[in-house]
Amino acid sequence: MSGNYYYPLDLSWSTEEISSVLHFLNKVELAYEKKVDAKQLLDSYKTYKTIVKSKAQEKQIDRDFQKVSGYSTYQVVKKAKAIEKGFFSLGN
């Protein structure tokens, strides 16, 4: 789903943290719109998890992002963990 939508960001995050979260969400978008390298996605997820530490917050961001974009961070990370390396796509 290409288009204009907002990213679920916490305004208490620093500029660097927001940049890291956006980097991860952009990788998720890439997994649906083209293809993404699993290792790069998992690296960005690792950084993302240093910012979004709680499972509850991670699930809320996934729900919010999926609601506005149609893309699931959970499904992308699950697929990346399953293949570990190489490119993959969840797009149609």
Swiss-Prot record:
SUPFAM superfamilies: BH2638-like (SSF158504)
Highest taxon of the lineage: Bacteria
Pfam family of the protein (one): UPF0223
Family: Belongs to the UPF0223 family.
The protein's name in its UniProt record: UPF0223 protein SPy_1248/M5005_Spy0958
Organism name: Streptococcus pyogenes serotype M1
